[in-house]
Amino acid sequence: MNLMITLLTNTMLTSLMVLIAFWLPQTYNYSEKTSPYECGFDPVGSARLPFSMKFFLVAITFLLFDLEIALLLPLPWAIQANNTSLTLLMSFMLIILLAIGLAYEWLQKGLEWTK
């Protein structure tokens, strides 16, 4: 019963938000609205500067380790389960896999974006 109430509530809230989005007035883009704002001054250069590929790789590596933390956060609750050996084994395998990946990136000089 609780599942049905949750699904019904989520469906109704989603439908309500979609209907409100259709009823809201349409916004129109014009040159002043789409230009970058720099403290009241005219823009000096382009706001679309390219990123270094090395910086992008470091950012992706950071996201992977952030995902690892998100996956390991529920571990204290999982340890309270009956079969903790499998949970700990999978957690250690994930940590070892990410440590090997970090070591590989380090050896390949993938973490240095200054060069």
From Swiss-Prot:
One of its GO terms (cellular component) is mitochondrial inner membrane. Its main location: mitochondrion. InterPro entries: NADH_UbQ/plastoQ_OxRdtase_su3, NDAH_ubi_oxred_su3_sf. It is a multi-pass membrane protein. Coiled coil: none annotated. The chain crosses the membrane at residues 3-23, 55-75, 86-106. GO terms for biological process: mitochondrial electron transport, NADH to ubiquinone. Gene3D superfamilies: NADH:ubiquinone/plastoquinone oxidoreductase, chain 3. Its EC number is 7.1.1.2. One of its GO terms (molecular function) is NADH dehydrogenase (ubiquinone) activity. Keywords: Electron transport, Membrane, Mitochondrion, Mitochondrion inner membrane, NAD, Respiratory chain, Translocase, Transmembrane, Transmembrane helix, Transport, Ubiquinone. It is found in: Mitochondrion inner membrane. Pfam families: Oxidored_q4 (PF00507). The keyword Ribonucleoprotein does not apply. It is an enzyme of class 7 (translocase). It catalyses: a ubiquinone + NADH + 5 H(+)(in) = a ubiquinol + NAD(+) + 4 H(+)(out). Core subunit of respiratory chain NADH dehydrogenase (Complex I) which is composed of 45 different subunits. Interacts with TMEM186. Interacts with TMEM242. Core subunit of the mitochondrial membrane respiratory chain NADH dehydrogenase (Complex I) which catalyzes electron transfer from NADH through the respiratory chain, using ubiquinone as an electron acceptor. Essential for the catalytic activity of complex I. Belongs to the complex I subunit 3 family. This is NADH-ubiquinone oxidoreductase chain 3. It comes from Loxodonta africana. The lineage of its organism: Eukaryota, Metazoa, Chordata, Craniata, Vertebrata.
